[in-house]
Regions:
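C-terminal binding/interaction regions
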Residues: 2-33, 40-47, 52-141
Length: 141
């Protein structure tokens, strides 16, 4: 089933249609927001984690530009309006519990983080070479 509210064709044209999910379908946190995991189209890099309230969700669906609620500034924030590093929506997909949105985006300028980095995830906690590979018993999932 196609869960996308907004799609972008190969020429870069957006196609907007009525989303299959409405804001009322989401399970929101105590502040009335839903976390959004932002992933770059193509590379599949995780760029950032942000939050949407209803107004941000509706504006994102309406414009095709990722819009969030800034918890620190208490205001609506369309990514890239001042920096030029816009995030154009490729798809919006809800997780199985309807409490998180995965946004696939076309990241303009290659920078998503306010620090100037490509991704907000650039502070290693445990390096891959230190992680032990463990097999998962699929029957016990």
């Amino acid at each position: 089933m196609d869960q996308r509210a907004i799609t972008q064709d190969e020429s870069g044209q957006f196609s907007f249609h009525q989303p299959r999910l409405q804001w009322s379908d989401f399970k929101r946190n105590a502040d009335g927001m839903v976390p959004v995991i932002v992933q770059e189209e193509g590379s599949k890099d995780v760029l950032m984690l942000a939050y949407m309230n209803e107004e941000a969700f509706l504006k994102t669906v309406e414009t095709g530009l990722m819009t969030y609620w800034s918890r620190s500034r208490n205001e609506l924030w369309t990514k890239g309006l001042t920096s030029g590093h816009r995030q154009e929506v490729v798809s919006l997909i809800a997780d199985c519990d309807y409490d998180t949105i995965l946004a696939t985006v076309h990241q303009i300028g290659g920078i998503a983080c306010h620090t100037g980095a490509h991704s907000c995830f650039h502070n290693p906690i445990v390096s891959e070479d230190k992680l032990e590979q463990k097999s998962v018993d699929q029957e016990n999932l």
